[in-house]
Structures are given as C-alpha cells and as structure tokens.
Curated annotation (Swiss-Prot):
Protein purpose: Nucleotidase which shows specific activity towards cytidine monophosphate (CMP) and 7-methylguanosine monophosphate (m(7)GMP). CMP seems to be the preferred substrate.
Assembly with partners or alone: Monomer.
Gene: Nt5c3a
GO biological process entries: adenosine metabolic process; CMP catabolic process; dCMP catabolic process; dTMP catabolic process; dUMP catabolic process; UMP catabolic process
The keyword Transferase appears for this protein: yes
Binding site for substrate: S198, A199, G200, K247
Coiled-coil ranges from the UniProt annotation: none
Tissue: Isoform 2 is highly expressed in the brain, heart, spleen, kidney and blood. Isoform 2 is expressed (at protein level) in the spleen, skeletal muscle and gastrointestinal epithelia.
The name this protein goes by in its record: Cytosolic 5'-nucleotidase 3A
Length: 331
C-alpha cells in the first residue's frame, strides 16, 4: 500500500474515533442537560432572590412543592400570618440595633432615666433566656411572663399619654424591612388577608405601619394593646398578655377570624422565633404552609434548630425580597 493510501486509511480511522468521542461527549451533555432541567428545584433555582448566601433551605424539594402549591392556589387561597418585631421591622441598620415596639416606648423622652435603666436591666436578664438554645419553650415560658409583666408595670408608672404616641413613633429609629411597600402593596392590591400577630405593643405597631402608609384594610393586628384612663393616660394593658412563647394560645383564641377565611387554605408564615411557628395553629384547614424564619442573632447557636423548624431560614437578612419573589409568582 502506497503512502497516500495509508494516509487516507489513517484519516478515516482518525475521523471515526473523533466521531465516536464527540458522540459520547454529546450524549453526556444531553443527559446532564435533561437531568438539570428536570430537577424538582427548578423554580427555586430560577429565582435570584433564593441564591443569596443569607438564604438557607434544609429541604429544597419540600420547599419547591409548597411554592408550587401556593402558585397553583393563587390569590383566592392565600393568607399571610406574620410576626412584626424583627420580622417585618428591621433588626439592625448600618450596624446599629433597631428598636422593637416595646423599645420605642422604652427609649422615648417621656420615660425617666431611672425607668429606662430598670427596663434595660430586665432586657439583659430575660433576653438571654428567650434566645437560649438549650432551654425548651416550656422552660422559657414563665420567664417571659415575668419580663413582660415587670416591663409593663414600669411603663404604667410613667403615665404615657395616648396623644403622644404619634410623636413617640415618629421620633424613634424604627424601620420596616426593605421591600415593605411592595409587600403590603401587592397584598392589598389582591385582597390577601394579613394577620400580624405580635408580642409587642399593638398601639405602637399600628402607628408604625400607619406612618409608613401601609396600614391597609386587609391588615388585622393582634397584640398587647394599651388601656388608657378617661384622661388618655396609660393605666394598663387590655386582655391577656401575649408574649413570644404563647402565640399558640393566642392563635386558638382567633379561630373566629380564621374560620371566616376557610377558603384561604394556603399560608405564608413569617417569624423570627420558635414561638412564631405556632401562629397558624388556629387555622383549621391548612393545605399548604410555607414557614419563613428570620434568624437575626446567635446564628451559630441557633441555625440548626431554625433549619429543622422553618422551611426557609433567612440569616441576618433585612429585606422582604424572598417573600416578595414568591408573591410575584403566586399573585
């Protein structure tokens, strides 16, 4: 065989090998592509808000299924059940702690320095118990009652006038989370019921969202409301105490509200504590519930517990963009 013939045979053989290799590579690519596009976490992966390092999900498949259920149900089936302090409001801004509803009153100029010192001592004593990763909710329960009862007693002694609440809130450093206008606006636009369940001070909470322009008719607030005397001076608090770990009882007391929403069987629950997980206990017919938890403090100690109990955990996250992205697809 002459050299030209040998060269032709070699070229054909080489081409055949290349074709085989190319075919294998192409098959592998197609298989990989199909596997990627066929994964159940497709919706989550397509949402850029879920790609941030602050978003932690233990079971993406379960979250995907719940979100698909929410999307399928649409506006007709949806309701929102949410905490307020450090959930809808910010935990911090530019490295500085933002106030809770109680802190807004504690820090106002109508409270004496002596009272403020005592309130701070109570916070230092009991907050450590509230976020202790070892103690059970049942063990924390009586300490929370002590804390709230003592704090409310001190505030009553100050004789806070109702007429000053608007000014007190306006002068405070309270801030709602980034994206709050979109959150409240879209929910109002579609008539979605919003149940704000707070262990804070209801009068202050309502004034915060009123001044932010988002206290719409679809929003219901359940909280610790002040009781004023005939002169408009604080004399006590109405009803039974709501604290961070008895929201289960409060939820059951609001079954009349939830029974009116029997068709709203899909729930997005927002909270920042283990106690907030019980806020939907008064809902009888739950089809899909997505629990989103903000982990603001002691992340290393509490992350595992939050990952076990919340579907989505948002670590040191000061925005509502994750829930807003879900609402965008659902409504």
């Amino acid at each position: 065989m002459d050299r030209a013939a040998v060269a032709r045979v070699g070229a054909v053989a080489s081409a055949s090998v290349c074709a085989v290799v190319a075919g294998v590579v192409l098959a592998q690519y197609i298989f990989t592509l199909k596997r990627k596009t066929g994964r159940k976490t497709k919706i989550i992966e397509m949402m850029p808000e879920f790609q941030k390092s602050s978003v932690r999900i233990k079971n993406p498949t379960r979250v995907e299924e719940i979100i698909c259920g929410l999307i399928k149900g649409g506006a007709a089936k949806l309701q929102i059940i949410t905490d307020f302090d450090m959930t809808l409001s910010r935990f911090s801004y530019n490295g500085k702690r933002c106030p809770t509803c109680h802190n807004i009153i504690d820090n106002c100029k109508l409270v004496t320095d002596e009272c403020r010192r005592k309130l701070l001592q109570l916070k230092e004593q009991y907050y450590a118990i509230e976020v202790d990763p070892v103690l059970t909710v049942e063990e924390k329960f009586p300490y929370m009652v002590e804390w709230y009862t003592k704090s409310h007693g001190l505030l009553i002694e100050q004789g806070i006038p109702k007429a000053k609440l608007k000014e007190i809130v306006a002068d405070s450093d309270v801030m709602l989370k980034e994206g709050y206008e979109n959150f409240f606006g879209k929910l109002q636009q579609h008539g979605i019921p919003v149940f704000i369940f707070s262990a804070g001070i209801g009068d202050v909470l309502e004034e915060v969202i009123r001044q932010a322009g988002v206290y719409h008719s679809n929003v219901k607030v359940v909280s610790n409301f002040m009781d004023f005397d005939e002169n408009g001076v604080l004399k006590g608090f109405k009803g039974e105490l709501i604290h961070v770990f008895n929201k289960h009882d409060g939820a059951l007391k609001n079954t009349d509200y939830f029974s009116q929403l029997k068709d709203n069987s899909n729930i997005i629950l927002l909270g920042d504590s283990q106690g907030d997980l019980r806020m939907a206990d008064g809902v009888a017919n739950v089809e899909h519930i997505l629990k989103i938890g903000y982990l603001n403090d002691r992340v290393d100690e509490l992350l595992e517990k939050y990952m076990d109990s919340y579907d989505i955990v948002l670590v040191k996250e000061e925005s509502l963009e994750v829930v807003n992205s879900i609402l965008q697809k659902t409504l």
